[in-house]
Protein backbone atom coordinates (compact mmCIF):
# COMPACT_ATOMS: atom_id res chain seq x y z
CA UNK A 1 0.00 0.00 0.00
CA UNK A 2 1.53 3.38 -0.95
CA UNK A 3 0.05 5.08 2.12
CA UNK A 4 0.98 4.93 5.78
CA UNK A 5 3.45 2.62 7.52
CA UNK A 6 4.61 -0.57 5.80
CA UNK A 7 6.91 -3.19 7.33
CA UNK A 8 9.58 -4.93 5.28
CA UNK A 9 12.98 -6.56 5.73
CA UNK A 10 14.52 -3.08 5.62
CA UNK A 11 12.38 -1.82 8.49
CA UNK A 12 9.32 0.40 8.47
CA UNK A 13 8.60 2.73 5.57
CA UNK A 14 6.46 5.77 6.40
CA UNK A 15 4.76 7.88 3.72
CA UNK A 16 2.57 10.98 3.85
CA UNK A 17 1.01 13.02 1.06
CA UNK A 18 1.12 16.71 1.95
CA UNK A 19 1.60 18.77 -1.22
CA UNK A 20 1.83 22.19 0.42
CA UNK A 21 4.43 21.30 3.07
CA UNK A 22 8.08 22.30 2.97
CA UNK A 23 9.22 19.91 5.72
CA UNK A 24 7.79 16.83 7.44
CA UNK A 25 9.33 15.11 10.47
CA UNK A 26 8.44 11.67 11.72
CA UNK A 27 8.04 11.54 15.50
CA UNK A 28 8.61 8.04 16.89
CA UNK A 29 8.05 6.57 20.36
CA UNK A 30 8.87 3.04 21.50
CA UNK A 31 9.95 1.46 24.80
CA UNK A 32 9.94 4.82 26.57
CA UNK A 33 12.24 6.58 24.12
CA UNK A 34 11.33 9.29 21.62
CA UNK A 35 13.07 10.56 18.50
CA UNK A 36 12.41 12.48 15.30
CA UNK A 37 13.43 11.58 11.77
CA UNK A 38 13.51 14.01 8.86
CA UNK A 39 11.40 12.70 5.97
CA UNK A 40 12.58 13.02 2.38
CA UNK A 41 10.54 15.10 -0.04
CA UNK A 42 9.57 13.12 -3.15
CA UNK A 43 7.69 14.06 -6.30
CA UNK A 44 3.99 14.95 -6.36
CA UNK A 45 3.76 16.07 -2.74
CA UNK A 46 4.96 12.87 -1.06
CA UNK A 47 7.28 12.63 1.94
CA UNK A 48 8.93 9.34 2.92
CA UNK A 49 11.24 7.87 5.55
CA UNK A 50 12.45 4.32 6.17
CA UNK A 51 13.43 3.46 9.75
CA UNK A 52 15.29 0.22 10.42
CA UNK A 53 14.21 -0.16 14.05
CA UNK A 54 10.51 0.75 14.17
CA UNK A 55 8.81 -2.60 14.79
CA UNK A 56 5.13 -3.33 15.28
CA UNK A 57 3.88 -1.46 18.32
CA UNK A 58 5.93 1.68 17.65
CA UNK A 59 3.89 4.86 18.03
CA UNK A 60 4.36 7.54 15.39
CA UNK A 61 3.01 10.88 14.19
CA UNK A 62 3.91 13.43 11.53
CA UNK A 63 5.07 16.99 12.34
CA UNK A 64 4.42 19.35 9.46
CA UNK A 65 6.59 22.44 8.89
CA UNK A 66 7.71 22.31 12.51
CA UNK A 67 4.22 22.92 13.86
CA UNK A 68 1.09 20.81 13.49
CA UNK A 69 1.52 17.19 14.63
CA UNK A 70 -0.98 14.72 13.17
CA UNK A 71 -1.70 10.99 13.19
CA UNK A 72 -1.31 9.01 10.00
CA UNK A 73 -4.45 9.37 7.82
CA UNK A 74 -3.76 5.78 6.71
CA UNK A 75 -3.10 4.53 10.24
CA UNK A 76 -3.80 0.86 10.72
CA UNK A 77 -4.51 1.47 14.42
CA UNK A 78 -4.79 4.42 16.78
CA UNK A 79 -4.99 2.84 20.25
CA UNK A 80 -5.42 6.17 22.08
CA UNK A 81 -8.08 7.72 19.80
CA UNK A 82 -7.98 9.97 16.77
CA UNK A 83 -5.96 12.88 18.14
CA UNK A 84 -3.08 10.75 19.41
CA UNK A 85 -0.21 9.02 17.58
CA UNK A 86 -0.74 6.04 15.31
CA UNK A 87 0.76 2.59 15.87
CA UNK A 88 2.80 0.45 13.51
CA UNK A 89 0.92 -2.81 12.85
CA UNK A 90 2.25 -6.01 11.32
CA UNK A 91 -0.54 -7.12 8.96
CA UNK A 92 0.99 -10.60 8.69
CA UNK A 93 1.06 -11.32 12.42
CA UNK A 94 -2.39 -12.88 12.55
CA UNK A 95 -2.50 -16.57 11.61
CA UNK A 96 -5.65 -17.16 9.58
CA UNK A 97 -7.55 -20.42 9.89
CA UNK A 98 -9.99 -19.93 7.01
CA UNK A 99 -7.84 -21.54 4.31
CA UNK A 100 -10.00 -22.45 1.34
CA UNK A 101 -12.70 -19.89 2.13
CA UNK A 102 -13.65 -17.99 -1.03
CA UNK A 103 -16.95 -16.54 0.14
CA UNK A 104 -20.48 -17.37 -0.93
CA UNK A 105 -22.41 -16.51 -4.07
CA UNK A 106 -24.78 -13.56 -3.87
CA UNK A 107 -27.91 -15.68 -4.26
CA UNK A 108 -27.17 -17.11 -0.80
CA UNK A 109 -27.23 -13.68 0.84
CA UNK A 110 -29.30 -13.14 3.98
CA UNK A 111 -27.70 -10.13 5.64
CA UNK A 112 -27.67 -9.21 9.34
CA UNK A 113 -26.63 -5.63 10.07
CA UNK A 114 -25.12 -4.99 13.49
CA UNK A 115 -23.31 -2.34 15.48
CA UNK A 116 -20.36 -4.00 17.21
CA UNK A 117 -20.66 -1.81 20.31
CA UNK A 118 -24.39 -2.38 20.81
CA UNK A 119 -24.64 -6.00 19.67
CA UNK A 120 -23.39 -7.50 22.95
CA UNK A 121 -23.02 -6.23 26.53
CA UNK A 122 -19.22 -6.07 26.13
CA UNK A 123 -19.49 -4.35 22.75
CA UNK A 124 -16.32 -5.87 21.32
CA UNK A 125 -15.12 -7.89 18.35
CA UNK A 126 -14.36 -10.84 20.60
CA UNK A 127 -17.76 -10.75 22.31
CA UNK A 128 -19.54 -10.76 18.93
CA UNK A 129 -17.92 -14.10 18.12
CA UNK A 130 -20.12 -15.76 20.74
CA UNK A 131 -23.27 -14.96 18.73
CA UNK A 132 -22.12 -16.19 15.32
CA UNK A 133 -23.47 -19.70 15.81
CA UNK A 134 -26.86 -18.26 16.72
CA UNK A 135 -26.91 -16.19 13.52
CA UNK A 136 -25.96 -19.15 11.34
CA UNK A 137 -28.68 -21.26 12.97
CA UNK A 138 -31.22 -18.50 12.34
CA UNK A 139 -30.52 -18.68 8.61
CA UNK A 140 -28.26 -15.65 8.26
CA UNK A 141 -25.45 -16.01 5.73
CA UNK A 142 -23.76 -12.59 5.94
CA UNK A 143 -22.95 -10.28 8.84
CA UNK A 144 -22.71 -6.58 7.98
CA UNK A 145 -20.75 -4.43 10.42
CA UNK A 146 -21.59 -0.77 10.74
CA UNK A 147 -18.53 1.44 10.06
CA UNK A 148 -15.41 0.72 12.10
CA UNK A 149 -13.18 3.60 10.95
CA UNK A 150 -11.65 5.29 13.99
CA UNK A 151 -13.98 7.96 15.37
CA UNK A 152 -13.56 10.46 18.22
CA UNK A 153 -14.56 9.27 21.68
CA UNK A 154 -15.77 5.91 22.93
CA UNK A 155 -19.09 5.52 21.12
CA UNK A 156 -20.43 6.42 17.71
CA UNK A 157 -22.55 4.96 14.93
CA UNK A 158 -19.36 5.00 12.85
CA UNK A 159 -20.25 7.60 10.25
CA UNK A 160 -18.02 10.20 11.93
CA UNK A 161 -14.84 8.26 11.23
CA UNK A 162 -11.67 10.17 10.38
CA UNK A 163 -9.07 7.38 10.09
CA UNK A 164 -10.61 5.05 7.51
CA UNK A 165 -7.92 2.33 7.71
CA UNK A 166 -7.98 2.01 11.53
CA UNK A 167 -10.65 -0.09 13.28
CA UNK A 168 -11.79 1.85 16.32
CA UNK A 169 -9.95 0.78 19.46
CA UNK A 170 -13.12 0.80 21.57
CA UNK A 171 -14.07 -2.49 19.88
CA UNK A 172 -10.66 -4.18 20.13
CA UNK A 173 -7.45 -4.59 18.18
CA UNK A 174 -6.91 -5.25 14.47
CA UNK A 175 -6.09 -8.89 15.21
CA UNK A 176 -9.28 -9.25 17.25
CA UNK A 177 -11.28 -7.99 14.26
CA UNK A 178 -9.52 -10.62 12.15
CA UNK A 179 -10.48 -13.23 14.74
CA UNK A 180 -14.12 -12.20 14.36
CA UNK A 181 -13.99 -12.50 10.57
CA UNK A 182 -12.09 -15.80 10.78
CA UNK A 183 -14.69 -17.19 13.18
CA UNK A 184 -17.54 -16.03 10.96
CA UNK A 185 -16.04 -17.87 8.01
CA UNK A 186 -15.86 -21.03 10.12
CA UNK A 187 -19.65 -20.73 10.45
CA UNK A 188 -19.97 -20.21 6.67
CA UNK A 189 -20.90 -16.59 7.30
CA UNK A 190 -19.75 -13.85 4.97
CA UNK A 191 -18.73 -10.56 6.60
CA UNK A 192 -19.41 -7.18 4.99
CA UNK A 193 -18.17 -3.80 6.16
CA UNK A 194 -19.97 -0.47 5.88
CA UNK A 195 -17.51 2.14 4.55
CA UNK A 196 -17.89 5.90 4.20
CA UNK A 197 -16.31 7.48 1.13
CA UNK A 198 -18.42 10.66 0.96
CA UNK A 199 -17.01 12.61 3.92
CA UNK A 200 -14.78 12.62 6.99
CA UNK A 201 -16.14 13.24 10.48
CA UNK A 202 -16.09 16.72 12.05
CA UNK A 203 -13.69 15.97 14.93
CA UNK A 204 -10.17 14.67 14.35
CA UNK A 205 -10.00 15.27 10.61
CA UNK A 206 -6.68 17.08 10.18
CA UNK A 207 -6.61 16.79 6.39
CA UNK A 208 -8.35 20.15 5.99
CA UNK A 209 -5.43 21.76 7.84
CA UNK A 210 -2.45 20.24 6.02
CA UNK A 211 -3.77 18.58 2.83
CA UNK A 212 -6.69 20.69 1.58
CA UNK A 213 -6.18 19.04 -1.81
CA UNK A 214 -8.22 16.14 -0.37
CA UNK A 215 -11.30 18.31 -0.88
CA UNK A 216 -12.89 20.09 -3.82
CA UNK A 217 -14.51 23.40 -2.82
CA UNK A 218 -16.34 23.48 -6.16
CA UNK A 219 -18.68 20.78 -4.82
CA UNK A 220 -20.62 21.06 -1.59
CA UNK A 221 -22.12 18.40 0.66
CA UNK A 222 -23.85 18.49 4.07
CA UNK A 223 -20.36 18.08 5.56
CA UNK A 224 -18.74 20.95 3.62
CA UNK A 225 -16.49 20.73 0.57
CA UNK A 226 -16.77 17.37 -1.18
CA UNK A 227 -13.96 14.85 -1.22
CA UNK A 228 -11.82 15.61 -4.25
CA UNK A 229 -12.58 12.87 -6.74
CA UNK A 230 -12.52 15.11 -9.82
CA UNK A 231 -10.56 18.30 -9.11
CA UNK A 232 -6.88 19.11 -9.34
CA UNK A 233 -4.57 16.48 -7.80
CA UNK A 234 -7.45 14.02 -7.46
CA UNK A 235 -5.40 10.94 -8.41
CA UNK A 236 -3.90 10.48 -4.96
CA UNK A 237 -7.29 11.02 -3.32
CA UNK A 238 -8.94 8.44 -5.56
CA UNK A 239 -6.12 5.98 -4.87
CA UNK A 240 -6.52 6.56 -1.12
CA UNK A 241 -10.09 5.28 -1.14
CA UNK A 242 -9.54 2.54 -3.71
CA UNK A 243 -6.68 1.21 -1.59
CA UNK A 244 -8.93 1.46 1.45
CA UNK A 245 -11.50 -0.81 -0.18
CA UNK A 246 -8.80 -3.28 -1.25
CA UNK A 247 -7.23 -3.13 2.22
CA UNK A 248 -10.39 -4.28 3.99
CA UNK A 249 -11.07 -6.98 1.41
CA UNK A 250 -7.51 -8.34 1.27
CA UNK A 251 -5.86 -7.66 4.62
CA UNK A 252 -8.97 -8.40 6.69
CA UNK A 253 -10.64 -10.80 4.25
CA UNK A 254 -14.00 -9.08 4.35
CA UNK A 255 -16.36 -10.56 1.77
CA UNK A 256 -17.94 -7.32 0.69
CA UNK A 257 -18.46 -3.64 1.33
CA UNK A 258 -21.53 -1.49 1.75
CA UNK A 259 -20.80 2.02 0.43
CA UNK A 260 -22.61 4.65 2.47
CA UNK A 261 -24.68 7.38 0.75
CA UNK A 262 -22.92 7.36 -2.60
CA UNK A 263 -25.39 10.02 -3.78
CA UNK A 264 -23.17 12.45 -1.82
CA UNK A 265 -20.05 11.37 -3.69
CA UNK A 266 -19.58 14.12 -6.27
CA UNK A 267 -17.49 13.05 -9.25
CA UNK A 268 -17.94 14.44 -12.75
CA UNK A 269 -14.99 12.54 -14.22
CA UNK A 270 -15.19 9.41 -16.34
CA UNK A 271 -14.96 6.72 -15.20
CA UNK A 272 -16.28 8.00 -11.90
CA UNK A 273 -14.85 6.74 -8.63
CA UNK A 274 -17.58 4.13 -8.09
CA UNK A 275 -16.92 2.55 -11.47
CA UNK A 276 -13.15 2.67 -10.97
CA UNK A 277 -13.36 1.23 -7.47
CA UNK A 278 -15.64 -1.60 -8.62
CA UNK A 279 -13.24 -2.41 -11.46
CA UNK A 280 -10.27 -2.48 -9.06
CA UNK A 281 -12.13 -4.86 -6.76
CA UNK A 282 -13.26 -7.09 -9.61
CA UNK A 283 -9.74 -7.34 -11.05
CA UNK A 284 -8.15 -7.71 -7.59
CA UNK A 285 -9.66 -9.78 -4.76
CA UNK A 286 -12.81 -10.38 -6.78
CA UNK A 287 -10.90 -12.38 -9.38
CA UNK A 288 -10.68 -15.43 -7.14
CA UNK A 289 -13.31 -14.86 -4.46
CA UNK A 290 -16.97 -13.98 -4.13
CA UNK A 291 -16.76 -10.26 -3.34
CA UNK A 292 -19.91 -8.15 -3.18
CA UNK A 293 -20.27 -4.36 -3.38
CA UNK A 294 -23.56 -2.91 -2.13
CA UNK A 295 -24.55 0.74 -2.52
CA UNK A 296 -26.71 3.10 -0.55
CA UNK A 297 -27.95 5.58 -3.15
CA UNK A 298 -30.96 7.84 -2.63
CA UNK A 299 -30.90 8.76 -6.32
CA UNK A 300 -31.89 5.21 -7.37
CA UNK A 301 -29.28 5.13 -10.16
CA UNK A 302 -29.90 1.82 -11.86
CA UNK A 303 -26.91 2.20 -14.20
CA UNK A 304 -24.56 1.20 -11.39
CA UNK A 305 -26.43 -2.11 -11.04
CA UNK A 306 -26.20 -3.38 -14.63
CA UNK A 307 -25.31 -6.97 -15.48
CA UNK A 308 -23.24 -8.48 -18.28
CA UNK A 309 -24.44 -11.24 -20.60
CA UNK A 310 -23.69 -13.86 -17.96
CA UNK A 311 -25.78 -11.86 -15.44
CA UNK A 312 -22.69 -10.87 -13.46
CA UNK A 313 -22.57 -7.36 -11.96
CA UNK A 314 -20.77 -4.82 -14.12
CA UNK A 315 -20.17 -2.51 -11.15
CA UNK A 316 -22.10 -2.89 -7.90
CA UNK A 317 -23.74 -6.14 -6.87
CA UNK A 318 -26.83 -4.51 -5.38
CA UNK A 319 -28.31 -1.44 -3.72
CA UNK A 320 -30.15 -1.00 -0.45
CA UNK A 321 -33.75 -0.48 -1.55
CA UNK A 322 -35.05 2.29 0.70
CA UNK A 323 -38.23 2.42 -1.38
CA UNK A 324 -39.35 -1.02 -0.27
CA UNK A 325 -38.80 -0.10 3.35
CA UNK A 326 -40.72 3.16 3.06
CA UNK A 327 -43.66 1.59 1.24
CA UNK A 328 -43.90 -1.37 3.63
CA UNK A 329 -43.59 0.98 6.61
CA UNK A 330 -46.61 2.97 5.45
CA UNK A 331 -48.55 -0.25 4.85
CA UNK A 332 -48.00 -1.62 8.36
CA UNK A 333 -47.90 1.60 10.42
CA UNK A 334 -49.97 4.17 8.54
CA UNK A 335 -47.28 6.83 9.12
CA UNK A 336 -47.07 9.35 6.27
CA UNK A 337 -44.79 12.11 7.65
CA UNK A 338 -41.53 13.12 5.97
CA UNK A 339 -40.34 10.92 3.14
CA UNK A 340 -43.18 8.49 3.80
CA UNK A 341 -45.44 11.05 2.08
CA UNK A 342 -44.12 9.79 -1.27
CA UNK A 343 -45.85 6.44 -0.65
CA UNK A 344 -48.99 7.60 1.17
CA UNK A 345 -51.37 7.55 -1.80
CA UNK A 346 -50.63 3.96 -2.90
CA UNK A 347 -48.45 2.24 -0.32
CA UNK A 348 -49.31 -1.33 -1.28
CA UNK A 349 -48.76 -0.57 -4.97
CA UNK A 350 -45.29 0.74 -4.21
CA UNK A 351 -44.56 -2.26 -1.99
CA UNK A 352 -45.57 -4.65 -4.76
CA UNK A 353 -43.66 -2.70 -7.38
CA UNK A 354 -40.49 -2.87 -5.29
CA UNK A 355 -40.85 -6.60 -4.80
CA UNK A 356 -41.30 -7.17 -8.54
CA UNK A 357 -39.30 -4.39 -10.23
CA UNK A 358 -36.80 -3.03 -7.69
CA UNK A 359 -37.20 0.70 -7.23
CA UNK A 360 -40.50 2.27 -6.26
CA UNK A 361 -39.46 5.52 -7.93
CA UNK A 362 -38.05 4.95 -11.40
CA UNK A 363 -38.03 8.50 -12.73
CA UNK A 364 -41.38 9.68 -11.42
CA UNK A 365 -41.68 13.00 -9.56
CA UNK A 366 -41.19 12.77 -5.80
CA UNK A 367 -43.63 14.99 -3.85
CA UNK A 368 -41.34 14.93 -0.81
CA UNK A 369 -38.50 16.31 -2.93
CA UNK A 370 -40.55 19.10 -4.50
CA UNK A 371 -41.76 16.93 -7.41
CA UNK A 372 -38.24 16.49 -8.75
CA UNK A 373 -37.88 13.32 -10.81
CA UNK A 374 -36.25 10.57 -8.77
CA UNK A 375 -34.68 7.37 -9.92
CA UNK A 376 -34.03 5.46 -13.12
CA UNK A 377 -35.99 2.55 -14.62
CA UNK A 378 -35.09 -0.71 -12.89
CA UNK A 379 -37.55 -3.19 -14.36
CA UNK A 380 -34.74 -4.55 -16.58
CA UNK A 381 -32.65 -5.54 -13.54
CA UNK A 382 -32.87 -8.89 -11.73
CA UNK A 383 -34.32 -8.98 -8.21
CA UNK A 384 -30.92 -9.73 -6.68
CA UNK A 385 -29.83 -6.17 -7.54
CA UNK A 386 -31.92 -4.87 -4.63
CA UNK A 387 -31.53 -5.51 -0.90
CA UNK A 388 -34.88 -5.51 0.92
CA UNK A 389 -35.49 -4.70 4.58
CA UNK A 390 -37.99 -3.53 7.18
CA UNK A 391 -35.41 -2.20 9.63
CA UNK A 392 -31.89 -0.76 9.40
CA UNK A 393 -29.77 1.46 11.63
CA UNK A 394 -31.02 4.45 9.60
CA UNK A 395 -34.71 3.66 9.65
CA UNK A 396 -34.75 2.90 13.37
CA UNK A 397 -32.07 5.25 14.65
CA UNK A 398 -33.17 8.30 12.72
CA UNK A 399 -36.49 8.32 14.54
CA UNK A 400 -36.50 10.77 17.45
CA UNK A 401 -36.79 8.01 20.05
CA UNK A 402 -35.22 5.16 18.08
CA UNK A 403 -38.37 3.02 18.15
CA UNK A 404 -38.30 -0.22 16.23
CA UNK A 405 -41.12 -0.97 13.83
CA UNK A 406 -42.51 -3.63 16.17
CA UNK A 407 -43.50 -0.88 18.60
CA UNK A 408 -45.55 1.10 16.09
CA UNK A 409 -46.89 -1.39 13.55
CA UNK A 410 -49.98 -3.56 13.40
CA UNK A 411 -48.44 -6.89 14.54
CA UNK A 412 -50.43 -9.02 12.09
CA UNK A 413 -49.59 -6.75 9.17
CA UNK A 414 -45.95 -6.71 10.24
CA UNK A 415 -45.76 -10.51 10.27
CA UNK A 416 -47.17 -10.54 6.75
CA UNK A 417 -44.62 -7.96 5.60
CA UNK A 418 -41.78 -9.95 7.18
CA UNK A 419 -42.77 -13.02 5.16
CA UNK A 420 -42.90 -10.95 1.97
CA UNK A 421 -39.39 -9.59 2.55
CA UNK A 422 -37.82 -12.91 3.57
CA UNK A 423 -39.32 -15.06 0.82
CA UNK A 424 -39.23 -12.77 -2.22
CA UNK A 425 -36.17 -13.29 -4.46
CA UNK A 426 -34.34 -10.08 -3.46
CA UNK A 427 -31.74 -10.66 -0.72
CA UNK A 428 -33.21 -9.68 2.66
CA UNK A 429 -31.45 -7.68 5.36
CA UNK A 430 -32.24 -7.82 9.08
CA UNK A 431 -31.19 -5.26 11.65
CA UNK A 432 -29.82 -6.72 14.88
CA UNK A 433 -32.55 -7.82 17.26
CA UNK A 434 -35.27 -7.52 14.64
CA UNK A 435 -35.64 -11.28 14.50
CA UNK A 436 -36.90 -11.50 18.10
CA UNK A 437 -38.68 -8.12 18.08
CA UNK A 438 -36.22 -6.52 20.47
CA UNK A 439 -37.81 -3.99 22.79
CA UNK A 440 -34.64 -1.90 23.02
CA UNK A 441 -34.48 1.23 20.86
CA UNK A 442 -31.57 2.05 18.62
CA UNK A 443 -30.82 5.67 19.37
CA UNK A 444 -28.46 8.03 17.64
CA UNK A 445 -25.33 8.24 19.81
CA UNK A 446 -21.89 9.85 19.73
CA UNK A 447 -19.17 11.10 22.10
CA UNK A 448 -18.01 14.54 21.01
CA UNK A 449 -16.37 17.31 23.03
CA UNK A 450 -18.62 19.92 24.70
CA UNK A 451 -18.87 22.47 21.87
CA UNK A 452 -19.56 19.98 19.09
CA UNK A 453 -21.77 17.89 21.37
CA UNK A 454 -24.06 20.86 22.01
CA UNK A 455 -24.27 21.64 18.29
CA UNK A 456 -25.20 18.02 17.49
CA UNK A 457 -27.89 17.89 20.19
CA UNK A 458 -29.42 21.21 19.15
CA UNK A 459 -29.22 20.30 15.47
CA UNK A 460 -30.98 17.00 16.01
CA UNK A 461 -33.82 18.63 17.94
CA UNK A 462 -34.14 21.34 15.31
CA UNK A 463 -34.35 18.63 12.65
CA UNK A 464 -37.38 17.07 14.32
CA UNK A 465 -39.02 20.46 14.92
CA UNK A 466 -40.17 20.31 11.29
CA UNK A 467 -42.61 17.55 12.23
CA UNK A 468 -45.98 18.59 13.64
CA UNK A 469 -45.52 16.13 16.49
CA UNK A 470 -42.48 18.07 17.74
CA UNK A 471 -43.70 21.62 17.23
CA UNK A 472 -43.79 22.05 21.01
CA UNK A 473 -40.28 22.96 22.30
CA UNK A 474 -41.05 21.07 25.51
CA UNK A 475 -41.51 17.86 23.51
CA UNK A 476 -38.37 18.58 21.51
CA UNK A 477 -36.47 18.70 24.79
CA UNK A 478 -37.49 15.09 25.51
CA UNK A 479 -35.56 13.82 22.48
CA UNK A 480 -32.59 11.89 23.91
CA UNK A 481 -29.24 13.66 23.93
CA UNK A 482 -27.03 11.56 21.63
CA UNK A 483 -23.86 12.49 23.53
CA UNK A 484 -24.89 10.84 26.79
CA UNK A 485 -23.62 7.40 27.64
CA UNK A 486 -27.23 6.48 28.42
CA UNK A 487 -28.19 6.84 24.75
CA UNK A 488 -25.58 4.23 23.87
CA UNK A 489 -26.37 1.87 26.75
CA UNK A 490 -30.11 1.94 26.01
CA UNK A 491 -29.33 0.89 22.42
CA UNK A 492 -27.65 -2.36 23.43
CA UNK A 493 -29.57 -5.55 22.79
CA UNK A 494 -30.94 -7.42 25.80
CA UNK A 495 -30.34 -10.98 24.71
CA UNK A 496 -32.44 -12.54 27.48
CA UNK A 497 -35.49 -11.24 25.61
CA UNK A 498 -34.83 -13.72 22.83
CA UNK A 499 -35.91 -16.54 25.16
CA UNK A 500 -39.20 -14.95 26.21
CA UNK A 501 -42.24 -16.66 24.61
CA UNK A 502 -43.57 -13.46 23.06
CA UNK A 503 -40.23 -12.67 21.46
CA UNK A 504 -39.59 -16.28 20.49
CA UNK A 505 -42.73 -16.25 18.33
CA UNK A 506 -41.02 -13.70 16.10
CA UNK A 507 -37.72 -15.56 15.87
CA UNK A 508 -39.63 -18.72 14.95
CA UNK A 509 -41.25 -16.83 12.06
CA UNK A 510 -37.86 -15.64 10.83
CA UNK A 511 -36.29 -19.06 11.22
CA UNK A 512 -39.18 -20.74 9.36
CA UNK A 513 -39.11 -18.30 6.45
CA UNK A 514 -35.34 -18.36 6.12
CA UNK A 515 -35.37 -22.16 6.18
CA UNK A 516 -37.86 -22.15 3.29
CA UNK A 517 -35.73 -19.62 1.45
CA UNK A 518 -32.61 -21.75 1.82
CA UNK A 519 -34.30 -24.98 0.77
CA UNK A 520 -36.58 -23.89 -2.06
CA UNK A 521 -35.80 -20.37 -3.28
CA UNK A 522 -32.06 -19.63 -3.02
CA UNK A 523 -31.06 -22.71 -5.12
CA UNK A 524 -33.18 -21.31 -7.97
CA UNK A 525 -31.82 -17.75 -7.89
CA UNK A 526 -28.39 -17.99 -9.54
CA UNK A 527 -28.54 -16.00 -12.77
CA UNK A 528 -32.22 -15.20 -12.26
CA UNK A 529 -33.62 -12.89 -14.92
CA UNK A 530 -35.65 -9.68 -14.48
CA UNK A 531 -39.02 -11.39 -14.67
CA UNK A 532 -41.06 -9.89 -11.85
CA UNK A 533 -44.65 -8.78 -12.34
CA UNK A 534 -47.28 -7.54 -9.90
CA UNK A 535 -50.89 -6.55 -9.42
CA UNK A 536 -52.64 -4.70 -6.62
CA UNK A 537 -56.34 -4.91 -5.91
CA UNK A 538 -58.14 -2.13 -4.02
CA UNK A 539 -54.88 -1.30 -2.19
CA UNK A 540 -55.64 -4.36 -0.06
CA UNK A 541 -54.54 -7.41 -2.02
CA UNK A 542 -51.08 -7.73 -3.51
CA UNK A 543 -49.85 -10.28 -6.04
CA UNK A 544 -46.34 -10.80 -7.35
CA UNK A 545 -44.78 -13.40 -9.60
CA UNK A 546 -41.20 -14.23 -10.56
CA UNK A 547 -39.71 -16.74 -12.99
CA UNK A 548 -36.74 -18.46 -11.37
CA UNK A 549 -33.61 -19.94 -12.92
CA UNK A 550 -35.11 -23.39 -13.53
CA UNK A 551 -38.23 -21.93 -15.16
CA UNK A 552 -40.40 -22.42 -12.09
CA UNK A 553 -42.67 -19.60 -10.94
CA UNK A 554 -42.61 -18.17 -7.43
CA UNK A 555 -45.97 -16.59 -6.62
CA UNK A 556 -47.07 -14.33 -3.78
CA UNK A 557 -50.57 -13.42 -2.69
CA UNK A 558 -50.99 -11.13 0.31
CA UNK A 559 -54.01 -9.56 1.96
CA UNK A 560 -53.11 -6.48 4.02
CA UNK A 561 -56.70 -5.50 4.77
CA UNK A 562 -58.52 -5.95 8.07
CA UNK A 563 -60.98 -8.44 6.57
CA UNK A 564 -60.82 -11.68 4.63
CA UNK A 565 -60.97 -11.48 0.87
CA UNK A 566 -61.29 -13.61 -2.25
CA UNK A 567 -58.22 -13.09 -4.43
CA UNK A 568 -58.87 -12.58 -8.12
CA UNK A 569 -55.51 -14.12 -9.00
CA UNK A 570 -55.60 -17.79 -8.07
CA UNK A 571 -52.36 -19.49 -7.09
CA UNK A 572 -51.43 -22.88 -8.47
CA UNK A 573 -48.56 -25.03 -7.28
CA UNK A 574 -46.82 -26.19 -4.12
CA UNK A 575 -47.48 -24.04 -1.08
CA UNK A 576 -44.12 -23.01 0.35
CA UNK A 577 -45.49 -20.78 3.08
CA UNK A 578 -48.94 -19.81 4.29
CA UNK A 579 -49.34 -17.56 7.30
CA UNK A 580 -52.82 -19.04 7.79
CA UNK A 581 -54.26 -22.39 6.73
CA UNK A 582 -55.47 -22.26 3.14
CA UNK A 583 -59.27 -21.95 3.19
CA UNK A 584 -61.86 -22.38 0.49
CA UNK A 585 -65.30 -20.81 0.33
CA UNK A 586 -67.71 -21.96 -2.37
CA UNK A 587 -64.74 -23.47 -4.17
CA UNK A 588 -62.76 -20.23 -4.15
CA UNK A 589 -59.64 -19.50 -2.13
CA UNK A 590 -60.00 -17.14 0.81
CA UNK A 591 -57.19 -14.96 2.11
CA UNK A 592 -57.70 -14.06 5.78
CA UNK A 593 -56.92 -10.56 7.02
CA UNK A 594 -53.19 -9.74 7.08
CA UNK A 595 -52.17 -13.02 5.50
CA UNK A 596 -49.54 -14.16 3.03
CA UNK A 597 -49.18 -17.19 0.81
CA UNK A 598 -46.17 -18.16 -1.32
CA UNK A 599 -46.44 -20.95 -3.88
CA UNK A 600 -43.98 -22.52 -6.30
CA UNK A 601 -45.24 -23.77 -9.66
CA UNK A 602 -43.00 -26.04 -11.69
CA UNK A 603 -41.94 -25.02 -15.19
Model-derived segments and spans:
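The feature marks proteins involved in alpha-glucan
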Residues: 1-9, 13, 34-113, 120-123, ...
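C-terminal beta-strand-rich structural cap/linker in extracellular carbohydrate-active enzymes
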Residues: 18, 56-58, 586-603
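Core domains of carbohydrate- and sulfate-ester-processing enzymes
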Residues: 64-99, 187, 205-222, 338-369, ...
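Substrate-binding/active-site clefts of carbohydrate-active enzymes
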Residues: 79, 99-106, 115-292, 303-304, ...
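Conserved alpha/beta catalytic core and glycan-binding cleft of carbohydrate-active enzymes
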Residues: 82, 274, 278-472
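Glycan-recognition and catalytic regions of carbohydrate-active enzymes
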Residues: 360-374, 430-445, 470-554
Amino acid sequence: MPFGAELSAAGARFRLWVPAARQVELDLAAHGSRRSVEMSALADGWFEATVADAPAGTRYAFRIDGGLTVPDPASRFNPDDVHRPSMVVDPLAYEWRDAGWTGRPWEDAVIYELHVGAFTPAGSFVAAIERLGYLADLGVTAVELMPLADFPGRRNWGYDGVLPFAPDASYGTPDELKRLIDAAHSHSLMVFLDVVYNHFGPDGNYLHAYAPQFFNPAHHTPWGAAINYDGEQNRTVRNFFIHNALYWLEEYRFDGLRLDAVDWIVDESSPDILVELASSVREGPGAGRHIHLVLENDRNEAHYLGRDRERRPLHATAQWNDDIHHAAHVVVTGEVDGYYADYAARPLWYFARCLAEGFGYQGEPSPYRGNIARGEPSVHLPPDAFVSFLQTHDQVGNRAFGERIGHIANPRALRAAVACILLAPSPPLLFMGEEFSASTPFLFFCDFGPELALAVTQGRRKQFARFARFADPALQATIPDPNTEAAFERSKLVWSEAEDPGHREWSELYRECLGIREAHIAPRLRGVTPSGSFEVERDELMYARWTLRDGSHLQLAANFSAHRSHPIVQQVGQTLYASHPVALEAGNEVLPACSVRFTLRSA
